[in-house]
């Protein structure tokens, strides 16, 4: 019989079903409100106040899944989108923004719908109107917003973006076009330290709110064997970012462009795109290599079979969960630890949110099917 008891306050340590004293309730799941804390289990050392976390605490903590904006292409975090002037970056930004706001697939990639803010800082509203109407006709979406002016990072850009997020809590993507428009002006603006600092500040913001910041930037004029060495400025920009896209053409007049993609938590890709000059959109022509996928995990497959759109939730103890999982033979505390470290994949591949809590009665886990189409 399915146990659908209501879960209580979230909790911290891992183990089997042992009962805990009623005087103490711990939590081991990071919620949306404290995404800015990278390691919830971190504790201050008595020596110099260094925040540390043990490997045990690391494994015993459930971290929020890194949500995709566009599957296998763009995730929450801070990314650079780099290309030569007039290569077609702004058309791509408009196309991406529209698809995310509408929830429409981008070529063969699934898109997760949400509000989009596009800071088109090198444009005016009249030009935006002409460009978008040429790309998409007059079919509009109410959750795609534009601004043509914004403060710099040092003068309060983060407060402006925070205000927008408060008004639109379902924001998934913010595009800054271009980086030069929001960076400080100074003699050392191209030093490694200043480049690293500005992207780090943007990344801190995107991590705090669990959104994607996509920052448009230019390539340098000199050629390089590695396309990512063509990013204008120093390696500090790429070093601090979660990933980068490099768009380049062999000749400026070509319709075809290569889009090289790298990221911390995603496979490298090289896409071939062709620009449709009539509609001013980029069309997918092919990828250099097939995306490598992790092989199926028997444990996650078994968990996924438990939940259906008709019965999208289950909660109970780890021991009760083991009884429901056919073909899984491990100890209860090992089960929770394996699910802890697989929470991101369980959510992104199967659409299942996993929570692990310690209550007065003992360990309790909760599984919720949030997206049956994952």
Language model segments and positions:
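Pre-Walker A (Motif I) flank of P-loop NTPase domains
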Residues: 75-79, 114
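Hydrophobic positions on the alpha1 helix immediately C-terminal to the Walker A/P-loop
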Residues: 92, 96
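Core recognition of P-loop NTPase motor domains used across DNA-transaction enzymes
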Residues: 2-75, 87, 130, 138-141, ...
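Phosphate-binding/switch region of NTP-binding enzymes
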Residues: 80-82, 86, 90-91, 119, ...
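Conserved inter-motif catalytic segment of the P-loop NTP-binding fold
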Residues: 46, 56, 64-65, 69-70, ...
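Helix C-cap/helix->beta junction micro-motif
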Residues: 168, 205-209, 350
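Post-Walker A helix-loop "phosphate-sensing" segment adjacent to the P-loop in P-loop NTPases
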Residues: 99-113, 347
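DNA transaction DNA-binding modules
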Residues: 272-374
